[in-house]
UniProtKB/Swiss-Prot annotation:
E.C. number: 4.1.2.4
SMART domains: DeoC
Family named by the database record: Belongs to the DeoC/FbaB aldolase family. DeoC type 1 subfamily.
Enzyme class: lyase
GO biological process: 2-deoxyribose 1-phosphate catabolic process; carbohydrate catabolic process; deoxyribonucleotide catabolic process
Cellular localization per UniProt: Cytoplasm
Lineage: Bacteria, Bacillati, Cyanobacteriota, Cyanophyceae, Nostocales
Function: Catalyzes a reversible aldol reaction between acetaldehyde and D-glyceraldehyde 3-phosphate to generate 2-deoxy-D-ribose 5-phosphate.
Organism: Nostoc sp. (strain PCC 7120 / SAG 25.82 / UTEX 2576)
Protein name (database record): Deoxyribose-phosphate aldolase
Chief localisation class: cytoplasm
Keywords assigned by UniProt, alphabetized: Cytoplasm, Lyase, Schiff base
Amino acid sequence: MAAGYPNIDIAPFIDHALLTPTATPEQVDQWCEQADRYNFASVCLYPTYVKQAAEFLHGKKPKVCTVIGFPTGATTRSVKLYEALEAVENGATELDVVINLGCLKSGNTEAVHREIAEICEETGQVVKVILETNLLTDAEKKIAADIAMDAGATFLKTNTGWNGGATVADVKLLKDITRERVGIKASGGIRTLNQALDLILAGATRLGTSRGIDLIHQRDNPEKVE
């Protein structure tokens, strides 16, 4: 473990993400094998690979997570719902859903709520609502968080990673807002063990990162952690 930090097993916090546009079926199998080997919480993939991941991880501990309306959140409500339902049919048990940022910023909170609530109610799965905190004011973060919780979200997720990464300040803010009523997933730019531990200590209960293996290596070789 990194010097100066409590002894935290980070592996069960990690959503092992493979969200590059060039992801291949071979990489999907590799990510699934790694998620199983290291006891990660889930493997997080594009919807096109959900069925493959679900077959690989059948009977194993890691969950199959996918992204909905990713990365902009600007698809229509009906398209997001269809995407979510199809993902569940193919084996996904966790859905990371990007909110409609335009509706949020224009004050159309009813549309934001309806979209999230429909997905939560009709899929019955774990829903992590992506707020894209780097594009929101603190006041907007609170509005978005309150909407997501009221609509039935299981987690609030900080970022897609396409517009900047998670910050300790945002995780602390979300923890204050949620008061542990839902989980908090920090995502985007998590590359070092110290970063991961800082986010966990700030209140993150999941970490979305493509660098899960690097984090494990840093955990197991603390003398190499800066």
